[in-house]
Each structure stands twice: as structure tokens, then as C-alpha cells.
Amino acid sequence: ESVVIPDPKRITLCISTQVGCPLDCQFCATGLMGYKRNLSSAEIMDQFLMVSRDYGKNKISNIVYMGMGEPLLNYANTLKTLQIFAEEKTKDISLRRITVSTAGIAPKIIELADSGLKVKLALSLHSMFEETRNKIMPINKKYSLKENLEAVRYYAKQTDTPITFEYVMLKDINDRTDDLNELLKLCKSLP
């Protein structure tokens, strides 16, 4: 699955890295279909090539690894495609216009930081409280919010790239004043 997000100033391509998703985030429809398999690097690149054919190669200005699946659970193939985009002959899209979105796989965030590929990173945050995050994002039980925040701070320092936080507001779950205050504290603590 890939999705084109048109905007008057840019065209963003949202690409998938897995068929389904194993994370079972409680607010995400993809989790309902279960996990089938990782996409190969060729299948990931094919999404870009097919949309480029339809829109024109130079029309796609941004890529987000934010479709179906968790990119950092398919790290080898995600990394391989990022390396392809980094090659001189595919420099149509700058790495600074590529964002990898993750639910929070802390060791892989650090690996990506050390890869030398300075792509943008987005953390699907959705709560600043471990207990709430455990309920709505079961992956938090394996890689805690604390671990992930340390990893994204490391990423920002290593890559000199700002971090994006994604936050779906869920009524009576993560929409309280305390949630907002903690989120503001986090944002103020980062460069």
C-alpha cells in the first residue's frame, strides 16, 4: 500500500514496509488485519517507482515511511532503500525530505542514527505516560517511552535533525491537561 498526499507546494509519497503490522496499536486500522510479512527492498522501492511513473519522477518531493507496518521492524530492507535514495543517481529526493516514522524500536533508532543517513525521524508518541502508552501501544512494554525518548535525543544529536512527534488524541485516554503539559515539557527539552 502506498498513498500520495498532494499539496500545492509538494507531493508526499507515503510508503509501506510490511504487509499488515505486528504492533497492534489500539487506534490503528492496519493492526486489525494482522501481520503477514516484511516487504523486500525491491517491493518498497517499487512503490516509489510506480508512483513516479504516474506523477513524474521529479514531482515527488517528500517520502514518508509511514504506510502499513513498522519500518524499524523491517530494518534491513528499510535501510537498503534509504541507501538507494542516498546514491548519487537517485538524488532526486534529498534524504532531508525523507521521514521514517516509528512506534518506537529504541535499539533500531540508535542504529539508524549511527548509519550516517540523515533522514528525518518521527516518533509515534500518543502518550507521555508509560501506563497509557502500554495500553494503546503494546510495543511500549518492550521498548519503554523512557528508552525511546533517550534514543530520539541521541538521534537528534547524531544527525542534527529535528524530531517529529505524532500524537493521535483519544477522548478520555490521552487528551487531559496533564497529557498536554507533559508533551509541552518534552518539546521544550529538545533542540
Regions found by a protein language model. Give the residues of each.
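Conserved AdoMet/S-adenosylmethionine-binding subsite of the radical SAM
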Residues: 52-62, 67-191
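N-terminal [4Fe-4S]-dependent radical SAM core
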Residues: 1-17, 44-58
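Canonical Radical SAM [4Fe-4S] cluster-binding loop centered on the CxxxCxxC motif
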Residues: 7-43
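Short, well-ordered turn and helix-capping elements at secondary-structure junctions
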Residues: 4-6, 32, 69, 104
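A broadly tuned preference for mixed-charge, low-complexity surface segments
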Residues: 35-54, 118-121
